[in-house]
């Protein structure tokens, strides 16, 4: 099973890129962030993407917004989509795929305008993850978490002490989340890559130089071994967003 996440930085500007990409790579589950549109503002091409069960959770006034798409050949009946209690500003959508695995598409606040609100969101997300695992559930968290986990996840020229996205307190919450029973799939499969970036500042050709940050993640439950990651790629060739898609491939045990 292929599960992908992408901060599109405006789906209306990236419509054809999104459609071309999913038809090229055929992910079974797609999580989008920062769609910057309400469902009413989307074209029929997007709302009726025929290969998928589609759920658009758009923010007001073209702000924020996430979506989730489940391939019909993977999930034969329309899954139930919903929002956990910690969802604010249309930042989270969840569903359960075959096998009882809960998938989240998450867009964590950047924190530039209200850093305490970002920490509150991350703490609530941590509590949610802990609750799922306490009930024996399995979870895949996909999205733009707006935190570079360690200094290795930031290009040396972009490392700035005290910069939002690199602060010890936000990193500590992300680390507690992982320690609560998640695995950072990109790092599990590529532990020493110091150029594994998913976001680049949009100036001076920094994407071409791969001078970026790793802000986009696929995190999966590590207990139970129902979810066995076998590949995770940053698709830097896709689209013109300042983020690249990340696609992980899992072998899902049937028991």
Language-model features: where?
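Active-site beta-strand/loop signature of hydrolases that rely on acidic residues for catalysis
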Residues: 3-7, 22-42, 103, 129-151, ...
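N-terminal, active-site-proximal structural segment of metallo-dependent hydrolase catalytic domains
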Residues: 1-48, 53-56, 63-66, 254-255
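Low-complexity, intrinsically disordered Gly/Pro/Thr-rich segments
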Residues: 227-236
